[in-house]
């Protein structure tokens, strides 16, 4: 609205960010594409809140060391699958609410959380329909972590929905069949949510220094990469090397405080 100071540009992809001018008149210019046309805006400062690995391409004037630090990690691929079933009698008959299956395509199967919201009510009886939550973290055992994540992403992108459907029906039939579950009869819907670039990269003691994992060392790539550059600051979960919401919120708070210190 015209009386608001905030402007949100939907469906607009940023392609280039750089400083303009010098001294007190210095600003940040942001170029973006909307409906096939390039536009630009200027401001006193800019917060880069996208993936770390993308930032060096958008802000090519960054120092080489900072670019290297931002490019260090890689996103972890994730598959979260929801399966609608007509009832959960099989779970009741087996006396379980979740199953861990490390040798199958989805490593975990569990009953959805009993949450009601407004007019939407969770299943209260085993005779009622419910959603099953399945999870898979594609990887390639035996390789260093980053290589595993890259190979897992390749697998995810090359796996067809038909394969997911067949493997889900087979898996649920095998683990729940003893409780009377029939995949052909009891499944009424499958939604496969694929995140090829899912969770932020986290450090581990097999491939990286212990202090990166167990301390807040300033030597960590996430710390080197998130340093302010001129009037450009960086905020995202990658900047904390953590996939959690609280980390993203804390990094956003830090980046905005940095902006407030020089505008």
Predicted regions and their residues:
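Conserved flavin/dinucleotide-binding core of flavoenzymes
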Residues: 33, 84, 90-263
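Mid-domain catalytic core of redox enzymes
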Residues: 6, 10-143
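Short mixed-charge
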Residues: 1-5
